[in-house]
């Protein structure tokens, strides 16, 4: 690759890699697991995620091709480690950064009824918005009542989503090197119509 095209090619490839993680919860879950664990083998992946060995090989291969996992071939038993991702998008002056924490939340959705329903009914954007409220909620800086109301979800459902995301926040805060880039809803109040 020439130096003149390295930046744009790398940027667009990174964009497509993040998009793929946010399209396939199974890949997102695997990526997040490897990121949390640091360095893993196929056996550890199959044991912990309870997926077939062929699926583990196929999915790790896909993630290596996407450059979000690195494979160490120096040992007899190959190990995999995650490459921390981040993607910042700006639309009409509004900026949002996708970090491994959102990828983890999405990867958990098929295994968590509340997150699954949120994504199915409202889409990935609502999950991203909920995460911006879950961070201050999980850290005790926002009540669940305020967070649920601001998310514009039925109260009990909003609280259930926040509680599911609280676990994501607590587990990813020390692992996600871009955690501080997650928007905090307290700093960006909802837009009001004129």
Show the residue positions of the predicted features.
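Short amphipathic alpha-helical interaction segments
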Residues: 51-62, 154-163
């Amino acid at each position: 690759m020439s130096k003149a095209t390295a930046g744009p090619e790398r940027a667009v490839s990174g964009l497509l890699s993040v998009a793929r993680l946010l399209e396939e919860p199974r890949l997102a879950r695997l990526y997040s697991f490897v990121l949390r664990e640091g360095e893993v083998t196929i056996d550890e992946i199959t044991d912990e995620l309870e997926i077939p060995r062929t699926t583990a090989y196929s999915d790790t291969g896909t993630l290596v091709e996407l450059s979000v996992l690195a494979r160490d071939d120096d040992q007899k038993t190959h190990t995999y480690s995650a490459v921390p991702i981040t993607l910042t998008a700006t639309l009409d002056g509004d900026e949002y950064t996708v970090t491994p924490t959102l990828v983890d939340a999405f990867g958990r959705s098929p295994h968590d009824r509340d997150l699954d329903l949120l994504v199915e009914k409202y889409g990935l954007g609502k999950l991203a918005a909920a995460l911006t409220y879950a961070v201050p909620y999980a850290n005790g800086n926002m009540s669940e009542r305020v967070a649920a109301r601001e998310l514009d979800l039925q109260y009990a459902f909003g609280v259930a989503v926040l509680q599911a995301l609280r676990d994501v926040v607590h587990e990813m805060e020390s692992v996600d090197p871009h955690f501080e880039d997650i928007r905090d809803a307290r700093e960006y109040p909802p837009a009001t119509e004129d």
